[in-house]
Design a protein with these regions (language model features):
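Glycine-rich phosphate/adenosyl-contacting loop at the front of the ribokinase-like
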Residues: 1-71, 76-80, 87, 260-261
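Conserved phosphate-binding/catalytic region of the ribokinase-like
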Residues: 2-15, 179, 210-321
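Conserved phosphate-binding/catalytic loop of the ribokinase/pfkB sugar-kinase fold
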Residues: 71, 97, 107-144, 149
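A glycine-rich helix N-cap at a beta->alpha junction
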Residues: 84-99
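Short gly/ser/thr-rich secondary-structure transition/capping motifs
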Residues: 88-89, 125-130, 170-177
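A short, aliphatic-rich alpha-helical micro-motif
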Residues: 139-140, 185-186, 227
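Conserved beta-alpha-beta core of the PfkB/ribokinase-like small-molecule kinase fold
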Residues: 144-220, 240-242
């Protein structure tokens, strides 16, 4: 399976990602606070993040050619974000600079690597439909487009439509979760990526009381997903792997088990890898299987982009698999 990494590099696969770039203000604690509670934490760490920037970085670090689209503010955080994207190998030449602060998140990570995240859009909220139109030639110079919902909905929808009409495969990450997606966005998106809880909310499916997602009727989930408008979807199950719906086929992707230090950004590493796999011509199920390795590697480090591995590092960590 790790041989797919060679294909990603050799194919010179091209990816456009539009969306969020944030500075993550991260603190560790023994446990996450309950509502109204204060707990002691460790030192505050500033790390590069943002769902879209994370996805772009993960794809670039394993060898894909990635263009990032979006906006940073006019503050010290802007240079910090751009520097880290460039270090990962991401093309930042189309990123705009707007007045005001860059995007930020406040993250708390507990001793088990679980986290809570609060997001402040900042410059990400200023990415407009006009910007999409001005960047259209560069946006469509790719094989796939990655989207999340940390940018204005009208901007995301316009970009999806532009790229879909140009023949790109469009992968939509419904996160931060929106239950009622615009019909035009659904129509213009080829693949949906959500976690198990987002899937349950989206399709109004009861979550299993024992958290046994393997006991779910995935054939029924696939039928409902098709009815919703997606013939292809990936449902991530955290540390339990993922499920891929590809037309009439359902694939259960096993997890890659590691001792997690911090799960921040693991879902984004997963999506970035799926983007890279699709851009290099691989099936959705194979791309998701490779993504299990890349996201597992990310869980063994601290932070989002800071924990992402190169193709060589991932091969070394997991061996010939």
């Amino acid at each position: 399976m790790l041989g797919l990494l060679d294909d990603i590099v050799a194919s010179r696969s091209r990816i456009s990602v539009i969306g969020s770039m944030n500075v993550d203000y991260t603190v560790t604690a023994k446990r996450l606070p309950k509502p109204g509670e204060t707990v002691n934490g460790g030192p505050l760490t500033l790390l590069p993040g943002g769902k879209s920037a994370n996805q772009a970085s993960a794809a670039a670090r394993i060898g894909a050619q990635v263009q990032m689209f979006g906006a940073v503010g006019e503050d010290a955080n802007a240079a910090f974000l751009l520097e880290h994207l460039r270090d990962a190998g991401v093309d930042t030449s189309h990123i705009a600079a707007v007045a005001g602060p860059s995007g930020t998140t406040v993250i708390t990570v507990d001793a088990n690597g679980e986290n809570t995240i609060v997001y402040s859009a900042g410059s990400n909220g200023e990415v407009s439909v006009d910007y999409v139109q001005q960047s259209s030639d560069a946006l469509v110079a790719a094989d796939v487009l990655g989207l999340c919902l940390e940018s204005p909905m009208e901007t995301v929808t316009a970009c999806a439509r532009l790229c879909h009409d140009a023949g790109l495969k469009v992968l939509l990450n419904d996160s931060p979760f929106v239950a009622e997606l615009p019909a035009e966005l659904i129509e213009a998106s080829d693949i949906l990526l959500v976690n198990e809880h987002e899937m349950a909310q989206l399709l109004d499916i009861a979550e299993p009381d024992d958290d046994d997602w393997d006991g779910l009727d995935w054939s029924d989930v696939a039928r409902q997903m098709h009815d919703f408008g997606f013939n292809q979807a990936v449902i991530t199950l955290g540390g339990d792997g993922s499920v891929v719906i590809d037309g009439d086929d359902i694939y259960r992707i096993a997890p890659v088990v590691v001792e997690a230090i911090d799960t921040t950004g693991c879902g984004d590493a997963f999506m970035g890898t799926v983007l890279a796999g699709l851009a290099s011509g691989h099936a959705l199920s194979d791309s998701a299987q490779l993504a299990s390795y890349v996201s597992a590697y990310a869980a063994t480090g601290f932070g989002a982009q800071a924990s992402y591995g190169t193709a060589a590092q991932i091969r070394e960590r997991f061996g010939a698999k």
